[in-house]
Amino acid sequence: MDAPYRIRSAVPADAAPLVAIERRCFSDPWSETSFREALDSPWSFGLVANTGQGIAGYLIAREVAGTGEVLNLAVSPDFRRRGVARALLRAGLVYLRKRRVEEVFLEVRESNRSAQALYLSSGFRPVGQRAAYYRNPKEDALVLWLALEQHA
């Protein structure tokens, strides 16, 4: 890998660089306020992959009553295909397992084949669909699920 990275907890002060990545990755990006609220919430957490050049990617997830949900995962186009997304996802699942979470859900755009490949290869399985879940452009979401006790 060209630029080594380390995974660390995200803090509200990371919101601006996360928005910059978000805008490069998604057509309907989260706002800085959305990131700050997620990172300030007692039910959610964030992880970032930090390089010598700044933040390469992030994961935002939450846990409620034994169920986890990956809310957002993105890697800057400059750092893709280097294992950053997989490392963030793996670290997020470890964190959720330590919190005694038993299952994890996420939504992914039907057209986002690379993200689907990551999630499926990490043990997630399709369990449903949400019609017109995404805006700009309007698109259905696949709902994926992972049983953490089976994913060690």
Model-derived regions, located:
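Conserved short alpha-helix immediately C-terminal to the canonical SAM/SAH-binding motif I
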Residues: 88, 112-115
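C-terminal "cap" of GNAT-fold acetyltransferases
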Residues: 102, 109-113, 132-152
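Acetyl-CoA-dependent GNAT
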Residues: 5, 9-80, 86-99, 128, ...
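Short, conserved catalytic or adaptor-binding loops enriched in Gly and charged residues
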Residues: 1-2
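DNA-binding alpha-helical recognition surfaces that contact promoter or target DNA
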Residues: 20, 117, 121
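Conserved catalytic-core motifs of GNAT/GCN5-like acyltransferases
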Residues: 33, 64, 107, 120, ...
